[in-house]
Amino acid sequence: LPLYNFGL
């Protein structure tokens, strides 16, 4: 689970 998944 990526921390920087702002809508990716």
Curated annotation (Swiss-Prot):
The keyword Secreted applies. GO terms for biological process: neuropeptide signaling pathway. The modification Leucine amide is found at L8. Its main location: secreted. It is found in: Secreted. One of its GO terms (cellular component) is extracellular region. Keywords: Amidation, Neuropeptide, Secreted. Belongs to the allatostatin family. This is Cydiastatin-6.
